[in-house]
Amino acid sequence: MKRRSVLLSGVALSGTALANDSIFFSPLKYLGAEQQRSIDASRSLLDNLIPPSLPQYDNLAGKLARRAVLTSKKLVYVWTENFANVKGVPMARSVPLGELPNVDWLLKTAGVIVELIVNFVASLPASAAAQFERIAAGLSGDLEAARQVHEALLEEAKNDPAAAGSLLLRFTELQTRVIALLTRVGLLVDDILKSASNLVTQGGQGDGLNRFRAVFGTLRLPEVADSFRDDEAFAYWRVAGPNPLLIRRVDALPANFPLGEEQFRRVMGADDSLLEAAASRRLYLLDYAELGKLAPSGAVDKLLTGTGFAYAPIALFALGKDRAGLLPVAIQCGQDPATHPMFVRPAESESDLYWGWQMAKTVVQVAEENYHEMFVHLAQTHLVSEAFCLATQRTLAPSHPLHVLLAPHFEGTLFINEGAARILLPSAGFIDVMFAAPIQDTQATAGGNRLGFDFYRGMLPESLKARNVDDPAALPDYPYRDDGLLVWNAIRQWAADYVAVYYASDGDVTADVELAAWVGEVIGSGKVAGFRPITGRSQLVEVLTMVIFTASAQHAAVNFPQPSMMTYAPAICAMSAAPAPDSPSGKSEADWLKMMPPTLVALEKVNIYHLLGSVYHGRLGDYRQTGFPYAPVFSDRRVTASGGPLERFQARLKEVEATIRTRNQARRKPYEYLLPSRIPASTNI
């Protein structure tokens, strides 16, 4: 019964996540958040009468006021390294009321959760589904009506800004409706858990891939379900998938990856060679050694999912002499060649090697999901932004120009990170169910990756250079790199223009005591590796670019591929139900199918990855307050004037959008994750 109950918890973020305090919080707490936003908005109106200023240029009264505000902020924004399930990682001890999500976010997220409920109910027997379908349909209709009211209120406030105050009463009524809707969503999940637990089974190995397709009841089956076994598609994941940050160019193969010249030529042709490919910059490697305890190699037994496996493979890719696109060459399913044989991509005529090769690719995809979710996604975006959010609130007064700039890029971050720690990472939570490693090892390894992430080395241009993939002449087809640099440079110019408004010289930077305190908190309490004192304007620009890019574009690039690329379990999964293949030959489709995860894992993947990748809240370049009527953040005419820094930034983003759309017409497949129109300003989901 417990096994089935957890299976059904995959319906929509798990029953407790919806019904209890973890995701939507209690109505009273939520109303308190709205009251706090109203207070903050009132203060903001007063602050807007005085342009932001550096502390050294404030008068005595202003300096005392700044100090008082920061003293009170430090009582609310409190560091801890003992947060449940992420111990050792600097986090907020609790989420302040003003950091809870607003009505706009709640409506969007609730809508996606209802979609997931409808999808799950569609897979139930008709007799059981009927009652839930009616309730879910009613919820969908009521949510749509609430969205329409919300949009109408915004339109009225936009057309008549002076009427915004009179609209607050109607907005308060909308809040009450939304709270009631959220309560109904939670009750529906509870009812499904109670009534349907005896109607769902986990399926078995004998039904092939049908059980994985069946979990897409009303949701669209991703295209990857029909292409994931294709070798070119497998290679394309490395440059345009959810984890485009591991592939690196190599001049020689590592000693523990003994691919022979003859094996290479079997794949790339008799007229090519390893030496020639290396010399012409055509060899590219994936090495998952960094996974550590996320790849225990041996069997791991779990109550809910049975036996699971994960490894730290090495995979070689190469470009042909025409550089048309990466091709997989060989895979070693672990770090030790003595225990893991080499799998070389077979020719079409080598049918006896086909399923062994597919099994080796599955081992790579298991490692890929582990690396992506725990390192690239959780550690290097969510948890990095957490540190900068806390430091900003604790050390930069609301009147500081950098606080005004950065705060919108942290909207929702503390809230969603607390949800990740409490819902995704506990024992028997989503990650424990979906991933092979023991949950304690997963928690510790993800935390270690966050603490080891070097801020300056993580900057996009530096990361590309360090991996030897920065030159388009060597690797022409790399959508993440090419589109990412467009967005990076647009943000960098915006940061430079903004800094120039408030910092007349490098001396202004070094004289800024609040900035110095911010740096100190990031280094000391935030434990951001590699961070160092800021001594001039150009360095400040690079730092701001990295902070903004991480919270917005980088998170978008690794988060929003999840629904289309990661919800179909056979294409990628963080655990295998069978060990890595021990021989390239003699394997069958049945052997490969044994590696597929339990249906429980497939359900969990659909629900969590569809949710996380389907909520788009806010947009890069659109700086608005979090409380109704979501007024503009900037009021300083030096920033907002026609042709000024903000308008130029928004114009550049439109140019980037047009360039990417043009590029997509010529690409193997459109890469849409870094379109500025699809990049939220903050990490809020």
From Swiss-Prot:
Remaining remarks: In vitro, under anaerobic conditions, does not transform linoleate or oleate into the corresponding hydroxy derivative.
Temperature dependence of activity: Optimum temperature is 25-30 degrees Celsius. Active up to 45 degrees Celsius, less active after 50 degrees Celsius and completely inactive at 70 degrees Celsius.
PROSITE patterns xrefs: LIPOXYGENASE_1, LIPOXYGENASE_2, LIPOXYGENASE_3
Binding site for Fe cation: 377, 382, 555, 559, 685
Protein family membership: Belongs to the lipoxygenase family.
Known EC number: 1.13.11.12, 1.13.11.58, 1.13.11.77
pH note: Optimum pH is 7 with linoleate as substrate, and 8.5-9.0 with oleate as substrate.
One protein family per Pfam: Lipoxygenase
Residues of the Lipoxygenase domain: 122-685
An annotated GO cellular component: periplasmic space
The keyword Transferase is assigned to this record: no
Subcellular location: Periplasm
Protein name: Linoleate 9/13-lipoxygenase
Signal peptide: 1-19
GO biological process: lipid oxidation
Gene it is expressed from: lox
InterPro entries: LipOase (IPR000907), LipOase_C (IPR013819), LipOase_C_sf (IPR036226), LipOase_CS (IPR020834), LipOase_Fe_BS (IPR020833)
Catalytic activity entry: (9Z,12Z)-octadecadienoate + O2 = (9S)-hydroperoxy-(10E,12Z)-octadecadienoate; (9Z)-octadecenoate + O2 = (8E,10S)-10-hydroperoxy-octadeca-8-enoate; (9Z,12Z)-octadecadienoate + O2 = (8E,10S,12Z)-10-hydroperoxyoctadeca-8,12-dienoate; (9Z,12Z,15Z)-octadecatrienoate + O2 = (8E,10S,12Z,15Z)-10-hydroperoxyoctadeca-8,12,15-trienoate
Record text on subunit structure and interactions: Monomer.
Function: In presence of oxygen, converts linoleate into (9S)-hydroperoxy-10,12-octadecenoate (9HPOD), which spontaneously decomposes to the corresponding 9-hydroxy-10,12-octadecenoate (9HOD), and into 13-hydroperoxy-9,11-octadecenoate (13HPOD) which spontaneously decomposes to the corresponding 13-hydroxy-9,11-octadecenoate (13HOD). Also active on linolenate. To a lesser extent, is also able to convert oleate into (10S)-hydroperoxy-8E-octadecenoate, which spontaneously decomposes to the corresponding 10-hydroxy-8E-octadecenoate. Is almost not active on arachidonate.
Keywords attached to this entry: Dioxygenase, Iron, Metal-binding, Oxidoreductase, Periplasm, Signal
Molecular function terms from GO: linoleate 13S-lipoxygenase activity; linoleate 9S-lipoxygenase activity; metal ion binding
Cofactor(s) named in the record: Fe cation
Species per Swiss-Prot/TrEMBL record: Pseudomonas aeruginosa
Classification via PANTHER family: LIPOXYGENASE
